[in-house]
Amino acid sequence: MFRVAIVGIPNVGKSSLFNRIIGQRKAIVEDIPGVTRDRIVSTAEWRGVKFEVVDTGGYITGDEDKFAPYIRKQVEKELELSDLFIFVVDGKQGLTPLDKEIANILHRTEKPVIVAVNKIDDPEKEKLAYEFYELGFENIIPISAIQKLGLAELLDKVVEYIPEYEKEIQEEEEKEEKRDYIKVAIVGKPNAGKSSLINALLNEERVLVSEIPGTTRDTVDILYEKDGQKFLFLDTAGMRKKSKVDFGLEFFSVGRTIEAIEKADVVVLVIDANQGATEQDTKIAGLIQRRYKPAVIVINKIDTVDKKTLEKVEKQVRERLYFISYAPIVFTSAKTKEGLDELLEKIVYVYNQAWKRVGTGQLNRAIKQIQNLRQPPTYQGKPLKIYYATQLEGKPPAFLLFVNKAEGFKENYVKFLENNLRKLLGLENAPIKLIFRGKEEEKDK
């Protein structure tokens, strides 16, 4: 989501403006410099467009306040995270040297800045805003956070900067939020038993089933409800090896399988217990992994193999599909209906895990714990460092890690981080995405 940070020196009215924008009194407002010591993040909406808004502590240069270094650090983090800055200045007090210092910092970010000249509670005082053009920013807007003057113009300008694709994503997400079902893509090799599985769930011959590979040529969407939970099953035709795919119906079935994976909330990969995980299953699992999709692996047709064989198949599937180790395995038989209830339970479970939010404190404690187990390696002769991490909006769980050298974090250590984060954060069955953002090494302290 587009992120807007409110910055400025202490006691210029940042928290009052923040409270006006979000429509509730969330930040503490007092006439004491530096009252807001932590960043407060909330979601705001203007003219139907949503964005994140952050109230930062007042920027202080010296250390006369014991919290000054902490506040500076919080503000500096927002310089990286935010997409736009509302720079609040005091119209009554006028331009200060500290305002100029903050302006220089904001110019270096090369991100859009709107200067909100606060405490202009009378239209006749708007001329007091003119001197702030000296800061070198194009957008100077006189406002009064207390009296709500100029706020519409300010927020109109904020929304102008939000990219169209962000607005389109919000519209799609709003549509998604209104639906009350989980979209499930049933994928796998032809004749692995996908359609039979759905028919067994539905107790009816809803999907065409035969012994001929690839009988189901199209993607068939089926809405199903169990114990008050709705599922929309996207039954696909199955993916075949490229050598066997001719242009025409088979070619488009592969494309539709990929499309179903992209649309799905949860992907169910169906594997034939008689064959185990094949090369083609591995490729389908790769599609699931690259799209960070929550998944359940189904070993189907268990009525056709003995227990010892099934144990070997499970081991082989885990070894071959190691890169989606987060996906739980369910054993099913469409013929005897064994494992069907467990399959539905796992679909709901992994779906909920994909939506899980983790507190910033909990996340950073987990990362510290992981580093105590195994420190990041060195890169170009210097140790790699993880400074701070935060969870991004949306699903699946995605974490932004601020590090000294992003390019130094290679697959081996990244996998180590991922696996341990899953354990420590209760995300064992969720795909997680780690994004590394590098910054210059801090000066020797």
Swiss-Prot record:
GTP 2 binds at residues 188-195, 235-239, 300-303. Keywords: GTP-binding, Nucleotide-binding, Repeat, Ribosome biogenesis. InterPro entries: G_ENGA (IPR031166), GTP-bd (IPR006073), GTPase_Der (IPR016484), KH_dom-like (IPR032859), KH_dom-like_a/b (IPR015946), P-loop_NTPase (IPR027417), Small_GTP-bd (IPR005225). PROSITE patterns: G_ENGA (PS51712). The keyword Repeat applies. Residues 2-166, 182-355 form the EngA-type G domain. SUPFAM superfamilies: P-loop containing nucleoside triphosphate hydrolases. GTP 1 binds at residues 8-15, 55-59, 118-121. One of its GO terms (molecular function) is GTP binding. GO terms for biological process: ribosome biogenesis. HAMAP family: GTPase_Der. GTPase that plays an essential role in the late steps of ribosome biogenesis. Belongs to the TRAFAC class TrmE-Era-EngA-EngB-Septin-like GTPase superfamily. EngA (Der) GTPase family. This is GTPase Der. It comes from Sulfurihydrogenibium sp. (strain YO3AOP1). The gene is der.
